[in-house]
């Protein structure tokens, strides 16, 4: 049988999603917890591999198992065996045509900046700190130049292994909530470091060093060296993954924390 899960995790303690030798990963911890409940080796596939320090509130995974368990048993049993900074949000049995990565039609991220002269003490690993005042409205205006299907070479990590830099950016919104600035971005898929590289360039606009139109120029230039620095990992969250409606997967608040879904 094939099971799909949605999980959330605080990525600050992990060297990313993917299992790696001699370091702790989210995948490793999840597979260990699943093996306790299944009483057999388990390998999971995820919708999007997050880097070291990146968080998730809506990561979707699937796994195959010969063990027959009721869905509440998977939910409670796996959560009981996970570290406190990883939790299962929902569980659903799916047929073998479902794949967490390849069935997905879009991914959605949020990047959270604590915009204050002083660094935060609480939630310090859950946000990125930027001390200069940022203009969220200008950042939002700049982000609109990236919408649609485009070549994102200027916002792609040098070592990105994707076969093509073309992605369809569906939604990008920048809003301010007191001292917090939230960059909400959705695309069919993302090249490596795309959200963090876009964020780094939007910060340049927000601090008044560049005009919003500069982002359009960057996109057309197709040169990573011209764009802003890669933003830190701490403020980034994978919050949602879209699938065709026929899969009827559960929906939960996107978060993180108090942030509204829209």
From Swiss-Prot:
Pfam families: PseudoU_synth_1. It catalyses: uridine(38/39/40) in tRNA = pseudouridine(38/39/40) in tRNA. InterPro entries: PsdUridine_synth_cat_dom_sf, PsdUridine_synth_TruA, PsdUridine_synth_TruA_a/b_dom, PsdUridine_synth_TruA_C, TruA/RsuA/RluB/E/F_N. Keywords: Isomerase, tRNA processing. Signal peptide: none annotated. The active site is at 51 (nucleophile). Substrate binds at residue 109. GO terms for biological process: tRNA pseudouridine synthesis. Its EC number is 5.4.99.12. GO terms for molecular function: RNA binding; tRNA pseudouridine(38-40) synthase activity. Homodimer. HAMAP family: TruA. Belongs to the tRNA pseudouridine synthase TruA family. Formation of pseudouridine at positions 38, 39 and 40 in the anticodon stem and loop of transfer RNAs. This is tRNA pseudouridine synthase A. The gene is truA.
């Amino acid at each position: 049988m094939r099971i799909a899960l949605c999980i959330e995790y605080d990525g600050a303690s992990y060297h990313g999603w993917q299992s790696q030798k001699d370091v702790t990963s989210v995948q490793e911890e999840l597979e260990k917890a699943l093996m306790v409940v299944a009483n057999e080796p388990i390998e999971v596939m995820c919708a999007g591999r997050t880097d070291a320090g990146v968080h998730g509130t809506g990561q979707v995974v699937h796994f195959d198992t010969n063990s027959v368990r009721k869905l509440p048993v998977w939910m409670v049993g796996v959560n009981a065996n996970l570290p406190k900074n990883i939790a299962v949000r929902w569980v659903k049995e799916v047929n073998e045509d479902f794949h967490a990565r390849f069935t997905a039609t879009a991914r959605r991220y949020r990047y959270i900046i604590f915009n204050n002269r002083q660094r935060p003490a609480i939630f310090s690993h859950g946000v990125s700190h930027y001390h200069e005042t940022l203009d969220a409205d200008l950042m939002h205006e700049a982000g609109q130049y990236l919408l649609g299907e485009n070549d994102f070479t200027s916002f792609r990590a040098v070592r990105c292994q994707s076969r093509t830099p073309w992605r369809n950016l569906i939604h990008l919104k920048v809003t301010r909530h007191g001292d917090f600035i939230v960059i909400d971005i959705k695309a069919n898929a993302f090249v490596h470091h795309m959200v963090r590289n876009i964020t780094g360039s939007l910060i340049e606009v927000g601090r008044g060093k560049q005009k919003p139109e500069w982002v359009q120029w960057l996109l057309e230039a197709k040169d990573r060296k011209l764009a802003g620095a890669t933003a830190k990992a701490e403020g980034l969250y994978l919050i949602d993954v879209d699938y065709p409606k026929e899969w009827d997967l559960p929906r939960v608040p996107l978060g993180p924390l108090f942030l509204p879904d829209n």
